[in-house]
Regions:
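Charged, alpha-helix-forming regions
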Residues: 1-168
Length: 168
């Protein structure tokens, strides 16, 4: 049986039309509906999502998770070599205090809680190591209620507000 002839153009187009494999994870609603005391930039939100996904996909090393900088950059669409900007964003993310259970009316809350989600971060030339707050670790890693967040969908976002709307 003769082979169907294809042109180079058809072959090239076919290469780029394959659907992208989802890069999803379960983000706890407690994190989505938390209220940071300061605003989160787009990079803060993308970093937090990449770190939470990595933590849910890989086992910890005595409470520390490691992610390769190149993998993280690909996951969040960070195409800059500006290491100082990455360090500043990680530092700022460490200082953001989240209030938990902000959906319930103030008078009806069973528990008010505030904490830092990522209390410690180490940035090395090729890896980033981070911790998730010990009291929140169980809720973050095995959430009962969650939203499926796909990092591939987050990549093209250029505004923190659009990413926040997608998550909600």
């Amino acid at each position: 049986m003769p082979r169907k002839k294809t042109t180079d153009e058809q072959s090239q187009i076919a290469l780029f039309q394959a659907p992208e494999v989802p890069n999803a994870f379960r983000k706890p609603v407690q994190v989505i509906h938390s209220k940071p005391k300061t605003s989160l930039s787009l990079l803060h939100r993308k970093l937090a999502n990449a770190w939470l996904k990595n933590a849910s996909d890989t086992p910890s090393d005595d409470g520390w998770w490691t992610i390769h900088t190149a993998t993280m950059a690909t996951d969040i669409g960070f195409d800059s070599n500006n290491r100082a900007y990455l360090i500043d964003s990680a530092r700022a993310l460490m200082g953001i205090i989240f209030e938990w259970d902000v959906i319930a009316p103030e008078g009806k809350r069973k528990l008010w809680k505030a904490s830092v989600l990522f209390p410690e971060v180490e940035i090395r030339p090729d890896t980033i190591r981070y911790q998730i707050s010990r009291p929140l670790r169980e809720q973050v890693l095995t959430p009962e209620m969650y939203a499926m967040i796909d990092l591939n969908v987050l990549k093209p976002f250029r505004r923190a507000s659009s990413l926040a709307l997608y998550e909600h």
